Amino acid sequence: MARYIGPKAKLSRREGTDLFLKSARRSLADKCKLDSKPGQHGRTSGARTSDYGTQLREKQKVKRIYGVLERQFRRYFAEADRRKGNTGENLLQLLESRLDNVVYRMGFGSTRAEARQLVSHKSITVNGVVANVPSQQVKAGDVVAIREKAKKQARIVEALSLAEQGGMPSWVAVDAKKFEGTFKQMPERAEIAGDINESLIVELYSR
């Protein structure tokens, strides 16, 4: 699947907020002007953004946060809409339970992109079986671990150390010494980033 490989800071500036694509622990706020759009002088517009434009921007932001392209994102939305309950919350839970995101949330990768690479390079197991599909859905009770051959990688050790200092989500339990973690349960909406307005995405696809 194609992936955006350009400057990560540019995407955060485009959305006007730090998407933590460079690092989950270090903010870009001190390095670049997040309230200034990309471009030589930072493009500005006096025109009021339409409702559609606002909804579209929110969808683009969430796609970039989780590293998902349009076709796959539409499939996630269709599945979220099919399930019982709140469609927006279902969508976020589907994205949060992707294997690459769970690896990131457990602190094995400093960014989702790095976590995705660990999965693609077969450095991750799920319930003892090697997994190499970043979009694999992790279920409650699944044990995600770093393979023995990858445990000495400096980037993994550093990422895990930083994650321990910053704290991990309550819906994962990580044993840093064993380089493994358990996906305890689906996260509740309050446990997912509060700067996402999923209702705008639901409104967009309901047009």
From Swiss-Prot:
Quaternary structure and interacting proteins, as annotated: Part of the 30S ribosomal subunit. Contacts protein S5. The interaction surface between S4 and S5 is involved in control of translational fidelity.
GO cellular component term, pick one: small ribosomal subunit
GO terms for MF: rRNA binding; structural constituent of ribosome
HAMAP family the record matches: Ribosomal_uS4_B
PANTHER family membership: 30S 40S RIBOSOMAL PROTEIN, SMALL RIBOSOMAL SUBUNIT PROTEIN US4M
Region (Disordered): 31-55
Record bears the keyword Protein biosynthesis: no
Pfam families the UniProt entry points to: Ribosomal_S4, S4
Keyword list, A-Z: Ribonucleoprotein, Ribosomal protein, RNA-binding, rRNA-binding
Family listed: Belongs to the universal ribosomal protein uS4 family.
Entry protein name: Small ribosomal subunit protein uS4
GO biological process, one term: ribosomal small subunit biogenesis
Compositionally biased region (Polar residues): 42-53
Function text: One of the primary rRNA binding proteins, it binds directly to 16S rRNA where it nucleates assembly of the body of the 30S subunit. With S5 and S12 plays an important role in translational accuracy.
Domain S4 RNA-binding: 97-160
Naturally occurring in which organism (per UniProt): Burkholderia cenocepacia (strain HI2424)
Keyword Secreted: no
